[in-house]
C-alpha cells in the first residue's frame, strides 16, 4: 500500500514455504525457485536484484525485508518445535531441506528424462510448458511472448509459458454433475473409463477452441461458453458421430447410453470433451513450437507430467500435433522431485540432477506415445484454421 507504507510494520518477508521452514527451524531464508517467481530476482545472478529492490524502496519500503537466498537442496536448519521431540530413527536432529518449493520446480526436477534435450508440460488445472536451460532467455521477443525464466534445481532455468490446462474440462464436468450426470461425477466419482472411451470415439478436430481466450477463465456456465466460442474444425465429415441423435452407439461402437436418462446428452458431452482435448493439444503444439523458436532448442521428447498425463488421448494428440514423442508420467512429479532433492540433501541419494531423474524414472509407470505421421496433416490444417480466426 503506497499510501500507508505497511511494509514499515514488518521485519521480514517470507513466502509460504519459507514461512513454514522458519516456523520449524527459526531460520529465515528465501528458497530460490519460489523467490524467482516474484520478479524480484536477477535470473542471471540467481539472487535478489538490487536495482529492482532499490526502485521499490521509496514507494513500498521493502528493500530490507527479504532474507538471503538459499538454493534448493540446501539444508535450512534443524527442526526445533517447542513441545515436540523431532529426531530421526538414529536419534539425530531432523533436518529441514529447502526443496524446489515452487511446485513446478519440483515437478521439473522429477521429470524422468534420460537426456538434457527435452521439453516438459506440467499439466494440471493450468499448464506450464517449456524447457530446461542453463541460462535465461532475456530477449524482448521472449518477454513479448509471455515467457518467463523461473529458476530451477542445480543451476537450471525453467524457460516456460503458463497456459490453459484441464480447467475447461473440469468446469464442464462440474456443470454436468450439477445436472445429475453420473458419468461426470454426480454420484461422487467421475466415470473416467466411460468418458475417455466416448471422447476418443468422437470425431477428431470437429470443433476447435482458442484455449487462450479470456472467456474461458471464469468459473460457471462453461459448456455454453465452449459451444459459443468453438469454430468448425477440419474433421467434419458425413459419417455418423456422437452428435447423431438417431443412434445410442457412436461410430466406434461405444455405447453412449440413453440421452434422456439425465439432463445431459452423452453425445453433446463427448463432442464438447473432444473439442476441449483437441484444442488443448493444439495449444501445446503452439507453446512447444514457440519454446523452441525462442530458446533455439529442439527437444528429443516431451515429458507430460501431472494430472493431465493420465489422459491418453491428450498425450497421443500432443505427440501427433508436435511430431515429438510424448512420455506421460509421473502424475505426482512434484512429490517425486521434492523427494529426490531431499534424499540427496541428507546423503541417501547422490549425483547430478540427471542421476536424481533416474530415480524418478525407475520409480514411475510411464507411457510413451509416438507421433503418427498419418495425423500430421490434420494438425497442420487445424493450426492454420485456428490461426486464421485469431
Regions found by a protein language model. Give the residues of each.
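Active-site core segments that coordinate phosphate-bearing ligands/cofactors
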Residues: 1-27, 40-42, 46-55, 86-301, ...
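A conserved helix-loop-beta module that forms one wall/lid of the active-site cleft
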Residues: 57-74
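Short beta-strand-loop/turn "lid" adjacent to the catalytic site in phosphate-handling enzymes
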Residues: 1, 21-42, 70-71, 76-81
Amino acid at each position: 500500500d503506497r499510501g500507508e507504507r505497511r511494509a514499515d510494520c514488518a521485519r521480514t518477508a517470507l513466502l509460504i514455504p519459507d514461512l513454514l521452514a522458519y516456523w520449524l527451524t527459526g531460520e529465515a531464508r528465501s528458497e530460490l525457485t519460489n523467490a524467482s517467481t516474484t520478479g524480484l530476482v536477477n535470473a542471471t545472478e540467481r539472487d535478489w536484484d538490487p536495482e529492482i529492490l532499490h526502485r521499490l524502496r521509496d514507494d513500498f519500503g521493502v528493500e530490507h525485508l527479504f532474507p538471503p537466498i538459499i538454493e534448493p537442496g540446501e539444508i535450512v536448519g534443524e527442526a526445533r518445535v517447542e513441545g515436540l521431540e523431532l529426531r530421526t530413527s538414529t536419534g539425530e536432529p531432523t533436518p529441514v531441506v529447502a526443496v524446489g518449493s515452487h511446485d513446478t520446480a519440483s515437478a521439473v526436477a522429477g521429470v524422468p528424462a534420460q537426456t538434457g534435450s527435452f521439453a516438459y508440460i506440467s499439466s494440471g488445472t493450468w499448464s506450464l510448458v517449456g524447457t530446461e536451460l542453463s541460462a535465461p532467455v532475456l530477449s524482448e521477443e521472449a518477454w513479448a511472448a509471455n515467457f518467463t525464466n523461473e529458476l530451477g534445481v542445480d543451476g537450471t532455468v525453467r524457460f516456460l509459458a503458463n497456459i490453459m490446462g484441464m480447467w475447461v474440462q473440469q468446469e464442464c464436468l462440474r456443470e454436468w454433475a450439477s445436472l445429475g450426470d453420473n458419468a461426470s461425477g454426480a454420484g461422487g466419482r467421475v466415470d473416467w473409463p466411460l468418458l475417455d472411451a466416448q471422447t476418443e470415439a468422437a470425431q477428431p478436430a470437429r470443433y476447435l477452441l482458442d484455449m487462450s481466450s479470456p472467456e474461458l477463465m471464469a468459473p460457471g456456465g462453461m459448456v455454453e461458453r465452449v459451444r459459443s466460442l468453438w469454430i468448425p474444425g477440419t474433421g467434419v465429415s458425413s459419417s455418423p458421430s456422437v452428435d447423431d441423435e438417431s443412434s445410442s452407439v457412436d461410430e466406434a461402437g461405444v455405447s453412449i447410453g440413453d440421452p434422456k436418462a439425465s439432463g445431459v446428452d452423452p453425445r453433446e458431452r463427448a463432442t464438447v470433451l473432444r473439442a476441449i482435448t483437441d484444442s488443448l493439444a493444439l495449444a501445446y503444439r503452439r507453446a512447444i513450437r514457440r519454446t523452441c523458436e525462442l530458446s533455439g532448442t529442439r527437444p528429443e521428447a516431451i515429458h507430460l507430467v501431472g494430472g493431465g498425463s493420465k489422459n491418453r488421448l491428450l498425450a497421443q494428440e500432443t505427440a501427433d500435433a508436435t511430431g515429438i514423442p510424448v512420455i506421460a508420467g509421473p502424475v505426482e512429479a512434484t512429490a517425486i522431485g521434492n523427494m529426490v532433492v531431499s534424499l540427496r540433501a541428507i546423503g541417501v541419494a547422490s549425483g547430478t540432477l540427471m542421476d536424481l531423474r533416474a530415480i524418478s524414472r525407475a520409480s514411475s509407470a510411464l507411457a510413451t506415445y509416438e507421433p503418427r505421421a498419418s495425423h500430421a496433416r490434420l494438425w497442420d490444417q487445424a493450426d492454420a484454421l485456428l490461426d486464421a480466426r485469431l
